[in-house]
Amino acid sequence: MPALLDKLLRAGEGKILRKLKAIAEQVNSIEDEFAKLSDGELRGLTDEFRARYADGESLDDLLPEAFAAVREAAKRTLGQRHFDVQIMGGAALHFGNIAEMKTGEGKTLVSTLPAYLNALAGRGVHVVTVNDYLARRDAEWMGRIHRFLGLEVGVISPQMGPAERKKAYAADITYGTNNEFGFDYLRDNMAWSVDEIVQRGHFYAIVDEVDSILIDEARTPLIISGPVDMNQKWYTDFAKLAERLQRGENGEGDYEVDEKKRTISITERGVQRVEDWLGIDNLYEPTNTPLVGYLHNALRAKELYKRDRDYVVIDGEVLIVDEFTGRILYGRRYNEGMHQAIEAKEGVPIKQENQTLATITLQNYFRLYEKLAGMTGTAMTEANEFHQIYKLGVVPIPTNRPMIRIDQPDVVFKTEKAKFAAVVEDIAQRHAKGQPVLVGTTSVEKSELLSGMLLRRGIPHAVLNAKYHEKEAAIVAQAGRKGAVTVATNMAGRGTDIMLGGNPEFLARQELAERGLSPVDTPEEYEAAWPEVLEKWKKAVAAEHDEVVQLGGLYVLGTERHDSRRIDNQLRGRSGRQGDPGESRFYLSLEDDLMRLFNGPMVQRIMETLNYPEDVPLESKMVTRAIRSAQTQVEQQNFEIRKNVLKYDEVLNKQRAVIYAERRRVLHGDDLHEQVGHMIDDVIRDYVRAATEEGYAEDWDLEQLWTALRSLYPVGLTIDQVVAECGGDRSGLTAEFLIERLTEDAHRAYAEREAALGTLPDGQPVIRELERRVVLAVLDRKWREHLYEMDYLQEGIQLRSYGQRDPLVEYQREGYTMFQTMLDGIKEESVRLLFSVDVQVTPVAEAPVAATAAADGAGTAAEGTAGVAVPQPAGASGPALQPVPAATAPGQQPVPAAAALSPGAGMRLADSPVAKLLAPPRPTRLQYTAPTIDGAAGSGEATAMTVDERRPSGAAARGPSPASASRQRAGAGEQARPLMYAGTPRSAKCPCGSGKPYKRCHGDPRNAG
């Protein structure tokens, strides 16, 4: 079926390309006309286009003229003219497609065309890049075109506060990374005032390196989490225990490792050893569940997470490495205890665990946009997935000049040692004649191994990996110069062209930056100096370019095949840009991960049969086909996992949409009085039905019902009064009558409550403001608890398959039930708090507004004379509510909030446990975790920013999620403490002197410590 769909998708390519070519011809036909316009006239076209759009013309109608204007502006600002194929690519993006354009074809310049056109609608365009460097670079570089045409350009960076972010999103075109856009969406839906909301909608997005972002990063979600209590000693203890346990196969040893699935299974022997070490009878008792999580994480840290491949240790800190790009992911941590397990393994300080507060997958975030488009050099291999999940077509755009790169067959050696020896020899020969060489490795460890071998041969080279990524743009820009040898961990997403002889544009920008000139800070001086500096560097590299062409162009040498064909193609694609010559080859060994895990035995049998020496390579198309088959298997497996993730996340996505829409309504100051009235009706109805659903009327426990109702509101009716109204006999009561009378009584009490609270000096009823505060606080807390419960449900749902039940159907059914329960809980708690919180109108001293630091959630709430201010939602005029003291209710996870204090009189909540429930969450440093490229196409699991437990595919050995771990800790009391007297036999008396057996005293994790 996928093959048939691929054929159908390709069948329409010719028709689409003919349409795009016709558009390019339209743009060409008016090019001379636009060239005659003055700068002012060209800039004035933007206002004209906007007016025509407002008068009813569509963006499609404006496309040829808008594209012609951008092409002319690019010539005048950058000295670059959009080729016809770039016009075609821009049109493909405007129509909501993915444009596949080979490396060096100018994708960045292409994006300016649809970005400008869609910005004319006035609703904002988001240009999404894979890293902050590219976002800043493109906002400055391509932003020159847009600013010349009168548009505002913004850029989002992690260091920005809310005000700066809001300004950036208000611009016509906003550049940023996928993670920043996604986190801003989540933060906006955690805001306590409209002023904190920074995004203004999701109209149109252009995603650069779209395959990396929408495919590779799609399996793991963006997560904002907050710290929870944990016992660090367990991580250290289990790290030591993991070192003692022995790996085995076929039931031997203490545990087994499946490297393909990246799972670990504990054997019976291993379980017995762990139980003996811990001094417990049954490791899998419910009270010991957290211990199982610690054990699994410790073993995964030992076997599956390798230093200098998956992470590096710098200055006593474990830093994650992006497998595909080789970059260090600063500030990112594995979730669910995995990062702490690695820290314990490495013997560095262990940092706190986190609990999920808000989450969304990139799949669902980008589906929020009304129109989505993307660019990449490698999309056709995933065309089926783009179509099925995102409804995006893939349009392969022709190259401006024919591709003449020579892709040599793979060569395979028996050992890694022999492979690297051959690699160094090949590099030495190419370097000796002056041909530039780009070497791709799959890990920091391998790049440094190769670097050491090159140093011993006396070959000068540059290393581009996670440890030196600050220099990466400069290194890549020079990788095409004569005699250059560049060793790169991976080339995916580098974003800088490798031009033969050197990159004149990069060198020109670098020189202007050294002079202190910037297109943003000093635009006039920058624009004046640019043409001369660019021309100087073009001349400087022209002669060297011709010389390198004669030497054969850039030689790309891959030292290992990746799980994904796209990553291999991205590495190869660095050579042969814009019709330049080039060559590529991959060197492999039977010890490489892909060969070892998939087709290694077959290839080894061939080599042994042919009696191949260790240092003689096997160069065969059959081997190449076997490797391609292995890669296809991995890609299909990962596609199925991503589809499965989407099915599960769709359940939470619908719930998220309901909650976030309601939250926005509250924040924007809608009158909640009618809604609160419905809440009262629903809660009273639920209380009565629960008390009357069984037995006859005379058997109903009305006393218990009245006791429950008194905890909800001040009941004015007595049981005798209600019975008297029914003729004096309880048998005459009906549930409907009780609901009617008690609802009337509750509304009477609420009206009295409103009158008693009175009004603020501006005339607004106090109860209206209180309603907003209460509903917002309760909704946030209940939603966080629901996320935590849904996470726990998803973690164990795969076990339902053993009972012949579809786990997805079960998850949908139970998730819906839990969501309805949460909504009922929001109503009940809101009503209870509205009746019970003690509010007083008191003078409040003027205090400054304190805003949350959006980047890290580390803002500080402002304090007035009456305590810490409750953030004031929009639409709420007048003074602020103030709880005293500002404390977080037990079990309530703090989230960042801005404090909006108004001078003059205000409302103050009397000191009580109820008031604490309405206290604004204390600003705290939050953890932002996000997927990286190895989330899908790489390891076959979502290892980058959140651990496997978040995906529903099930595994043999996985630790608890943040939510479940927190709940298990809460349920098990103090079990998670290091065992005292750990060497004591389990049946012996405990050394503490209690007289109890050790296993029932300090040998029990619940009593340990």
From Swiss-Prot:
Gene Ontology CC: cell envelope Sec protein transport complex; cytosol; plasma membrane
GO term, biological process aspect, one: intracellular protein transmembrane transport
Cofactor(s) required, per the database record: Zn(2+)
Enzyme Commission number(s) from the entry: 7.4.2.8
Acetylation recorded as keyword: no
Family, per entry: Belongs to the SecA family.
Record's protein name: Protein translocase subunit SecA
Organism: Acidothermus cellulolyticus (strain ATCC 43068 / DSM 8971 / 11B)
Lineage per the UniProt record: Bacteria, Bacillati, Actinomycetota, Actinomycetes, Acidothermales
